[in-house]
């Protein structure tokens, strides 16, 4: 697709040749014609990177015949819809920070990082509606962040001009987004993008790129892939991350070609040893790659004739969730191992995404990557001082604000996505039961993990003393508002999965206890158990409300909820909703009447 640029604020004396010469002098040669009008002109660039370079180099910076020219994307009003481009983003900015910033102005359907040779980052953002994109344009234009000023443009939204295929969701129908599909797509049409990320020695980066980029262009052309070499990340590092986007076959072929280039370069520079293949993989997927008692890894080693090692868990942090899988062997052997390793990682990733999407149907608008709860949804721009300086796996996975989830399950009067704009929500206490052997993983070394988790969630998290020497479960006491409960419980479920406390193919199911006023227990059960049965059918959680339980000193009884994370969360919220309704009725009606109505 051509990138049409608008050149404005031109003097009447400017000619097409003037513009060609100016662009040429700035090493921005124009291949096509210059369409010159009175006071403005249009030019085309076939490549988005060249278009960005022209905007950044010329707009507001270059004078021609006494006037400072303006350069931007040429987007007709008809195509100014949901898509914007943000430039001049600090290169070290973490995705979570950008998440939060973008989410303030609406539901973000997609963010894709543009692979440019500029020092700063560029992203293309798609909002759910035209109005949200317009607000983001107005609010973020010129936004200052650490001495960087954001530059924002509309980019064409092809969805507006193209006719809608029959299967496309109509305006107002959010089903395609809720299922994680691109707008207008189907589950078959959209393949999950799971890139291969590898580390290459810095001294081989030049050889992989080649003179004037010819080698890397040849790789991408032959394999139909996109290869991002993050050579500007973490200057001085011994290794640089490379991200390869393609089909599984294209990814493996591109990886093989890169391995061959590195080995050839090593041979020519008299480096004796074989160059290992180093694959970066999220810790949440690595357990399933290894397999029970290491069987999967041993099988790959045996079949490919390689030696495979995986970096220590101690290298991980909440901001650096990746581990390094080092494969040693011949180029052919390493390439074969890469195919098998990626097959396992991709399968684990797709299973996780399937589970997320199935449960997210219960929770409209939910996307976990916005909260960073589950491993496979987590994409970050690494901190500048990270151990590997690894950049994000682009294109950035679609994410939305979590306001859709909270607005559907939490009453609006409690809080919005930004609690400081509202009255403080009520503190809730949830007791979550985890396997005894998982306590160390939740606490972390010298309590580091549990403190980090409490800060992230904005909750108080304590592990109750064991009730006896041989108990199989321990109680985690979580105190905080609804959003904090969601984050804290989600991270605990995710941690248990990552650390292999449950079988790779097994869902993490935990028991949670919440206390409700004894006077509302009957309402939670419903007539003949109707309400609790409906609740279980809706949420897939097991909900147990003991009828003969003696209330505690606060006249409260315990409701037990057993299920996976989404099931448990939905059940907790629905039960709280019932309790809230009863409280409102008690405030509305005299005491005697309220109790009669609740029976």
Swiss-Prot record:
The tissues in which it is expressed are:
Expressed in oocytes, granulosa cells of small and growing follicles, Leydig cells, spermatogonia and semen (at protein level). Expressed in testicular cancer (at protein level). Expressed weakly in heart, placenta, skeletal muscle, bone marrow, colon, kidney, salivary glands, testis and pancreas. Detected in fetal liver, fetal ovary, gonocytes and interstitial cells of the testis.
Q: Where is the composition biased (Basic and acidic residues)?
A: 170-180
Q: What is the lineage of its organism?
A: Eukaryota, Metazoa, Chordata, Craniata, Vertebrata
User: What is the recorded name of this protein?
Assistant: Insulin-like growth factor 2 mRNA-binding protein 2
Q: Which keywords accompany this UniProt record?
A: Acetylation, Cytoplasm, mRNA transport, Nucleus, Phosphoprotein, Repeat, RNA-binding, Translation regulation, Transport
Q: Which family does it belong to?
A: Belongs to the RRM IMP/VICKZ family.
Region (Disordered) location:
157-188
Which Cys pairs does UniProt list as disulfide-bonded? none
A molecular function (GO) held by this record is: N6-methyladenosine-containing RNA reader activity
Q: Which residues, renumbered to this chain, carry the PTM Phosphoserine?
A: 11, 162, 164
Against CDD domains, the record matches this protein to:
KH-I_IGF2BP2_rpt1, KH-I_IGF2BP2_rpt2, KH-I_IGF2BP2_rpt3, KH-I_IGF2BP2_rpt4, RRM1_IGF2BP2, RRM2_IGF2BP2
Name the GO cellular-component terms.
cytoplasm; cytoplasmic stress granule; cytoskeleton; cytosol; nucleus; P-body
Localisation per UniProt entry:
Nucleus; Cytoplasm; Cytoplasm, P-body; Cytoplasm, Stress granule
Q: Where is the RRM domain?
A: 3-76, 82-157
Supply any other comment. Autoantibodies against IGF2BP2 are detected in sera from some patients with hepatocellular carcinoma.
Instruction: Give a GO biological-process term.
Output: nervous system development
Which residues does the UniProt record annotate as the domain KH?
193-258, 274-341, 427-492, 509-575
Q: Which domain of life is it from?
A: Eukaryota
Residues modified as Phosphothreonine: 550
């Amino acid at each position: 697709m051509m990138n049409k640029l608008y050149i404005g604020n031109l003097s009447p004396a400017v000619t097409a040749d003037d513009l060609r010469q100016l662009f040429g002098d700035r090493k921005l040669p124009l291949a096509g014609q210059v369409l010159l009008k009175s006071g403005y002109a249009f030019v085309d660039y076939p490549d988005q990177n060249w278009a960005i370079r022209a905007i950044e180099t010329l707009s507001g910076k270059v004078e021609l015949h006494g006037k400072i020219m303006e350069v931007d994307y040429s987007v007709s009003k008809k195509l100014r819809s949901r898509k914007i481009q943000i430039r001049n983003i600090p290169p070290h900015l973490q995705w979570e920070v950008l998440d939060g910033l973008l989410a303030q102005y609406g539901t973000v359907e997609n963010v894709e990082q543009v692979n440019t040779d500029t020092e700063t980052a560029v992203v293309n953002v798609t909002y759910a509606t035209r109005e949200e994109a317009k607000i983001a344009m107005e609010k973020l234009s010129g936004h200052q962040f650490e001495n960087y000023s954001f530059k924002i443009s509309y980019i064409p939204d092809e969805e507006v001009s193209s006719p809608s295929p029959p299967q496309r969701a109509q305006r107002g129908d959010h089903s395609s987004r809720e299922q994680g599909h691109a707008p207008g797509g189907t589950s078959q049409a959209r393949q999950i993008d799971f890139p291969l990320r590898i580390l290459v020695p810095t001294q081989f980066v030049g050889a992989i790129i080649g003179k004037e980029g010819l080698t890397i262009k040849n790789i991408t052309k032959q394999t139909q892939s996109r290869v991002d070499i993050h050579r500007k990340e973490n200057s001085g590092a011994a290794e640089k991350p490379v991200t390869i986007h393609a089909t599984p076959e294209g990814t493996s072929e591109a990886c093989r070609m890169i391995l061959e280039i590195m080995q050839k370069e090593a041979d020519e520079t008299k480096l004796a040893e074989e160059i290992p293949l180093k694959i970066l993989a999220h810790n949440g997927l690595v357990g399933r790659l290894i397999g029970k008692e290491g069987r999967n890894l041993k099988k790959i080693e045996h079949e490919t004739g390689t030696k495979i090692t995986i970096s220590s868990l101690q290298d991980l942090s909440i901001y650096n969730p990746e581990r390094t899988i080092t494969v040693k062997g011949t180029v052919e052997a390493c390439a074969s191992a890469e195919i098998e390793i990626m097959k396992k990682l991709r399968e684990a990733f797709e299973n996780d995404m399937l589970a997320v999407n199935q449960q997210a149907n219960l929770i409209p608008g939910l996307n976990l990557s916005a909260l960073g709860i589950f491993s496979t949804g987590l994409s970050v721009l690494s901190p500048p001082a990270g151990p590997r300086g690894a950049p994000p796996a682009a294109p950035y996975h679609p994410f939305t604000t979590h306001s859709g989830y909270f607005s559907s399950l939490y009453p609006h009067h409690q809080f919005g996505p930004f609690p400081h704009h509202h009255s403080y929500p009520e503190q809730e206490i949830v007791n979550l039961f985890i396997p005894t052997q998982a306590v160390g993983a939740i606490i972390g070394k010298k309590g580091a993990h549990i403190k980090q988790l409490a800060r992230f969630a904005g909750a108080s998290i304590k592990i109750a003393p064991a009730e006896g020497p041989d108990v199989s479960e321990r109680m985690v006491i979580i105190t905080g508002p609804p959003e904090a409960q969601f984050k804290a419980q989600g991270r605990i479920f995710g941690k248990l999965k990552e650390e292999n406390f449950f079988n790779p193919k097994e869902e993490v199911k935990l028991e949670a206890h919440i206390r409700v006023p004894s006077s509302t227990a009957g309402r939670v059960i419903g007539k003949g158990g109707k309400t609790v049965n409906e609740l279980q059918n809706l949420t897939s959680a097991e909900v147990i409300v003991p009828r003969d339980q003696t209330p505690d000193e606060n006249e409260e009884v315990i409701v037990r909820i057993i299920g996976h994370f989404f099931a448990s969360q939905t059940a907790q919220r629905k039960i709280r909703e019932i309790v809230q309704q009863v409280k409102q009725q008690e405030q509305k009606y005299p005491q005697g009447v309220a109790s009669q109505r609740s029976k």
